[in-house]
Amino acid sequence: MSMKRHLLIDLGAAWTRIVRVGDSRLWNEPSAVMTSADEPPRILAVGAEADAAVERPPDNIRVRRPQSEGRIAEPDLAEKQFSFWLQRHFGRIALPALYPCLTLTVPCGAMEYERKALTDMGRAARFMAVKLVDELAAHAAGLDEQVPPDEPTVVVAVGAAYAQAGVVRNGAVLTQRMIHAKNTRDGAAGNAVTEELRHWINKTFGLSVGEDQVERLKRGEAHKIVGYSVIEECFKTVEITDAQISQAVRPVLARLAELVEDVIDDGVRSVGESVRESVRRHGVFLTGGGAKLKGLADFVRETAHVPVALAAEPEETAIRGLQRLEARQ
């Protein structure tokens, strides 16, 4: 089988990244599916086309995200999403021929039934073989910084729906922790930052704002936002400083700093003092799209009292790690 017919996917709640083995191109797909509102729902669009309707979908359609909190929330939709990506990036293959091999990232805290659900989903999408790789192992392999593989590396991956941290050595995850929260604001990932900011804006200025504006504020692309004041019954514009943003999301930053401290302590207990020695030499590595939040690295450094390094392109670390792991096979 041609190696180019092997697909690597970093499956995320907000974004999914896709690479073909032997091809340097990287596809970024919003993890969104647009369906009709009737039952059973009909798929109308997948990816960017669906994501564009998230803020103001018409009454007769729904925009859904099959992946949530590191789990497949809607298996049927996820399978159709996979089939769409297959056709887009592989082209059509006449049935009943099987599609090629698939390697997927999976959260380290995933239960056996959750891993089986991912494997079953891949097979239902007609992949011949499905392999799962722990996300933290992929993130560690994707780091540009050269850490000897036999040294323990502390990796903190901050995604949209959840944050996880672990100690990785020789491609194996030795210890790991994940922050899940039923209430998004109680989490430690990108969605928690968004909700915390939105709540702070509403409490401070009495304004209701859309998710797209909060996301731009979070990424540092804008400091002025327009929101609707229910009390004054009009739209108002306010300017928000970086210092205000940092203060607003401080609860989320504190949970991430605590996660770092806990996973280092876990590593020392299970692996030994070599974990602290490696952290002193190389630092704790922040990866994932949520790691780009301004002030996060400094806050963790000052609160957890450890050196911190931000991956060069944190949102692509896991998919690049899958490429490197596959190249070693």
PLM regions with names:
Residues G159-Y162:
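Gly/Ser-rich catalytic serine loop of serine hydrolases
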Residues M1-E29, M34-R42, A48-V156, V168-V284, ...:
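Nucleotide/phosphate-binding catalytic cleft detector across ATP-hydrolyzing
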